[in-house]
């Protein structure tokens, strides 16, 4: 959250025109507008991919394999629009802070950002965090079942 505040306070979001500020606040608005079920399911799918990336990187022998193992699942989670609570702890405050700064008022005029509030952050983080926990636990259970479960004699 501190990084989001510094980025907003330094007017980084308008360095290259208004499009970046509009994109940041629009992303935050989309995240704050998710239903509980959508946040939960996107959180599960996201952390399945994040944990899979870590698992692959541990299994890879070469540095290139480790990088590819991390990169591809993370790329997929970003491209699919899945939700991760840690990422949202940046994205949503990065949308909240410009809304409170008069320097961004002209750039953000006409943008529907009514959901971008601290309550919106909480309404996103609760289901997404639960989903992340369930997704990580699901992959952990699969790992346990496949590799660590002792066969019945």
Residues covered by each model-derived region:
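Alpha-helical transmembrane segments and their helix-helix packing motifs
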Residues: 1-153
């Amino acid at each position: 959250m501190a990084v989001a505040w510094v980025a907003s306070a330094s007017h980084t979001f308008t360095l290259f025109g208004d499009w970046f500020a509009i994109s940041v606040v629009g992303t935050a608005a989309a995240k704050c507008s998710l239903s509980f079920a959508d946040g939960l399911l996107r959180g599960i799918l996201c952390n399945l991919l994040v944990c899979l990336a870590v698992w692959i990187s541990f299994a890879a022998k070469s540095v290139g394999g480790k990088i590819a193992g991390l990169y591809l699942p993370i790329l997929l989670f970003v491209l699919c629009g899945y939700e991760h609570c840690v990422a949202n702890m940046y994205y949503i405050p990065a949308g909240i802070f410009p809304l409170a700064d008069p320097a961004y008022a002209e750039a953000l005029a006409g943008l529907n950002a009514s959901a971008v509030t601290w309550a919106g952050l909480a309404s996103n983080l609760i289901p997404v965090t639960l989903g992340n926990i369930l997704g990580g636990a699901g992959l952990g259970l699969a790992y346990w079942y496949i590799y660590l479960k002792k066969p019945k004699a």
